[in-house]
A protein has these predicted regions:
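Aromatic-rich juxtamembrane segments at the membrane interface
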Residues: 161-293, 298, 574-577, 600, ...
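Hydrophobic alpha-helical transmembrane segments in multi-pass membrane proteins
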Residues: 7, 47-49, 224-390, 453-505, ...
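Non-globular, low-confidence helical/coil segments that flank catalytic cores
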Residues: 122-125, 129, 136, 156, ...
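Alpha-helical transmembrane segments of multi-pass integral membrane proteins
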Residues: 345-451, 720-725
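Membrane-interface helix/helix-cap signal primarily in integral membrane proteins
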Residues: 58-232, 236, 559-566, 572, ...
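Residue-level signal for inorganic ion chemistry
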Residues: 82, 334, 374, 601, ...
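N-terminal leader/targeting segments
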Residues: 1-71, 289
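Hydrophobic alpha-helical transmembrane segments
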Residues: 1-5, 180-192, 211-219, 263, ...
């Protein structure tokens, strides 16, 4: 069976996907797969039968996982008996910890708002394991995705068999009774203690990297540095990868042999230590994969198996085993990246990588192979890839593998054994880590190397995979005519084809993005002829005590609007229209300016700009972005699409909401009114100046506040549809019942982001349809 386990792994994958996604396409694919094995691999009937049995086995495993993926806890439950199963995560004044309910045998996520700095310090020192705790709280469903391409937290937790979040008001350890700890709990407690030990005994630069490489925990990392690693495509180095595990195992094995221990003893020792190491490092997919592969190889050596286990067989068996115990993991980005990249490197090693004799060219080829293998998954999950990662990997992989990994283990051992680490070692590592962090942040700002075509659909994913297979085929075929030219052309096609596809898209769209209590509307014209963003949303920041501050507080521009735009493949904003100076409308502009190319900013012509507007002007100046102060009478036309500014008057000196930019747009055969937070006073001025004004779609002013959308205004413009951008359960009571009643009186169809998520109007040659993201 040497070299054939891969065929069973493919059958297992198809079996699970048949259940998890759509049955018919994957069942037909499995049928075709069996035919290809018979036709080209000369599989006998018995072998084909085994592959079919493997497919059916994993089909039923997947079916069982789907059928049991639901909660048994009644939503009215308020009292719970919990065993904490993971390390607590403390971020500012928020504590989160996973637990298992003793009555329902179901996992839950606990959230607790810490009351004081003293309580926070105390909770950091407490053990959450080997105890049964009684807590009272309110069950709530995890958040769902309310915008296209947004992260679906509810689905993410559901695939981990977590269906509820409990909000508790009292200390989670207040009413607990001790229990006998299990071996797994003891190891997890050791991990948590180790992370806390690093945090309290080393500078944060060393502690954060040590926690990541020794224990698989990235919570100590500076969010800006972590983002830089992600943007440059080398964040995998901050996870405990297969390379790290292999190096560590080789190091331990070598040390054992040098100390006179037998090979058999060391193999037995490593077989015992590997499962412990997986738990100690957090059990990420990359660690589990590499540990399983090494475990299988060591096991065959121990049992003196006649057949050598090749790397391809090891990764195939690891994949099958992993999927057997956790079929839901197939959707985990870490799982997909770990197995796909490792598989492609294993397959390419004898055909591609061995053709490079020089170390540096082999490293470059390996880095390129890994980047190409990861490309479809990176684009699907994160919408962007940095080409600079190919070069960065060549510098950072040796640095992490041969300096950081052994060096940080050494620092930890010295500190633990002697209670003190020589200052010279601390100084050296702190300097090197700071320099490497500075370099990665510098490289992350190279937008030229960032490739952002957006999230590919299924058709585009298939095209990507086809092009990649063609690239690898030509690359490994040494006698292929004009090999280098064809490879270069294919790689260029790989990079530009989705952006070309986006440009050919004949559909335009208007999307009211769900940004909570704020406004942000995208206008994207067909064939990429124009991209306009009306407002950016914004997060209100209130001054808090230092200990309450989160490491990376939620910011709607960075966390909602930018991912939405990147998911659409949008990297350039032709006009950023900031209707007025309120934070909930323009606070996210800083993230937009930082992450995307903004060509022009339109702001209202007012006498007294807000502090936020002045800060945006300063940022625009740094980026050489043209800023235009617009007023009544300004307009622009792109093809059949026309935009006319109705308000404010030039050098407006009144109340800020009254001075909002209000304009009419003709888009997709429909007339639109956009007016920011325009109040009734501003509306009255407009209907007096334009007594014949009629619109099809009204963006309701000020989130449906009763200070906007006056009855006289609605009666005159007679909208067929009203869009209200409003936060769910907001403290202002928006939209106001009076406004809703006014709109209903005129038979206006109302769409609300708090209830329906993003609202999109998609149009083609003067006709279109409007649809909410949520049903």
């Amino acid at each position: 069976m040497n070299g054939k386990y891969i065929y069973f792994a493919i059958a297992a994958l198809l079996g699970v996907l048949c259940v998890q996604l759509t049955f018919l396409p994957f069942f037909l694919l499995q049928t075709l797969y069996l035919y290809l094995l018979y036709k080209y691999k000369r599989f006998m009937k018995f072998q084909l039968g085994l592959v079919a049995v493997c497919f059916l086995t994993f089909f039923f495993i997947g079916q069982h996982a789907v059928s049991t993926n639901k909660t048994a806890i009644p939503s009215s439950t308020t009292t719970f008996y919990l065993q904490y199963t993971e390390d607590p995560k403390i971020d500012g004044d928020l504590l989160q910890v996973q637990a298992a309910d003793a009555r329902y045998k179901e996992k839950l996520l606990i959230r607790y708002k810490i009351q004081s700095e003293q309580e926070k310090d105390l909770l950091k020192t407490k053990t959450f394991y080997h105890c049964l705790c009684r807590v009272s709280g309110t069950l709530g469903k995890p958040a769902i995705a309310k915008n296209p391409n947004a992260f679906n937290y509810r689905k993410y937790l559901s695939r981990k068999n977590i269906y509820w979040i409990i909000e508790i008001q009292e200390n989670p350890l207040q009413t607990c009774s001790p229990m006998n700890p299990s071996p797994v709990e003891l190891i997890k407690q050791l991990r948590y203690s180790g992370i806390n030990y690093l945090e309290s005994h080393f500078p944060i630069e060393i502690a954060s990297l040590s926690a990541a490489l020794l224990f698989g925990d990235r919570n100590l990392f500076d969010p800006e540095v972590l983002t830089a690693y992600q943007k440059t495509g080398i964040v995998h180095l901050l996870a405990i990868s297969g390379l790290h595990v292999s190096l560590l195992i080789a190091m331990v094995f070598y040390i054992g042999i040098r100390f006179g221990l037998t090979r058999q003893f060391m193999i037995n020792f490593l077989l015992i230590i590997l499962p412990i190491y997986v738990i100690l490092t957090g059990g990420s997919p990359s660690v589990i994969r590499s540990a399983m592969m090494i475990f299988l190889v060591l096991l065959t050596v121990k049992l003196k198996a006649r057949l050598r286990l090749f790397p391809l067989d090891a990764i195939s068996l690891a994949f099958i085993s992993y999927l057997f115990f956790n079929p839901m993991v197939i959707f985990d980005a870490g799982f997909q990246l770990s197995f796909s990249v490792s598989l492609v490197i294993i397959l390419s090693a004898p055909y591609i990588l061995q053709g490079y004799e020089k170390t540096i060219t082999r490293m470059l080829a390996t880095s390129l192979v890994a980047q190409l293998a990861a490309l479809p998954f990176l684009l699907y999950h994160y919408f962007e890839v940095s080409m600079i990662g190919i070069i960065a990997n060549m510098v950072y992989i040796p640095l992490f593998s041969f300096v950081y990994l052994p060096g940080l283990y050494l620092l930890f051992i010295i500190q633990f054994m002697f209670g003190k680490t020589p200052l010279i070692l601390i100084s050296i590592f702190r300097t090197i880590i700071s320099l490497s962090n500075y370099l990665i942040e510098y490289l992350a700002d190279f937008t030229f190397f960032r490739f952002i075509p957006g999230r590919p659909n299924w058709f585009l994913l298939i095209v990507y995979i086809f092009i990649l297979l063609l690239i690898f085929f030509i690359w490994e075929t040494k006698a292929y005519p004009k090999r280098k030219v064809h490879l270069f052309v294919l790689i260029v096609v790989l990079i530009i084809f989705q952006q070309g596809w986006n440009w050919l898209n004949p559909y335009g769209e208007v999307t009211m993005i769900d940004v909570g209590q704020g406004d942000s509307i995208l206008i994207h014209l067909a064939h990429d002829k124009g991209t306009y963003l009306i407002d950016t949303g914004g997060t209100m920041n209130y001054t808090e005590e230092k200990w309450r501050e989160r490491a990376r507080a939620f910011e709607v521009g960075r966390d909602v609007v930018v991912p939405f735009l990147k998911g659409q493949g949008i990297t350039k904003i032709d006009k950023l229209i900031l209707t007025h100076g309120d934070m909930d409308h323009i606070g996210g502009a800083f993230s937009i300016i930082k992450e995307l190319e903004v060509k022009q900013i339109l702001m209202p012509s007012v006498v007294e700009p807000s502090i936020t507007e002045l800060a945006i002007l300063e940022e625009a100046k740094k980026k050489n972005i043209t800023v235009i102060k617009v007023s009544e009478g300004d307009k622009w036309i792109i093809g059949e699409n026309e935009f006319d500014i109705l308000s404010p008057e030039k050098n407006f000196a009144g109340e800020r909401n009254s001075g909002s930019i209000a304009f009419i747009a003709q888009l997709g055969g429909v007339s639109w009114f956009f007016g920011g937070d325009l109040d009734q006073e501003g509306e009255e001025k407009i209907i007096k100046k334009y007594p014949n004004l009629k619109v099809d779609v009204l963006k309701a002013g000020h989130h449906g506040s009763k200070t906007s959308s006056a009855e006289s205004f609605i009666n005159q413009i007679s909208p067929r549809i009203a869009l209200i951008s409003v936060g769910e359960k907001n403290r202002f009571g928006h939209p106001h019942s009076e406004v809703l009643n006014r709109l209903r009186k005129t038979n206006t169809v109302i769409f609300r982001t708090d209830q329906q998520g993003a609202i999109t109007y998609k149009f083609y040659q003067g006709k279109g349809t409007i649809s909410p993201y949520l049903p």
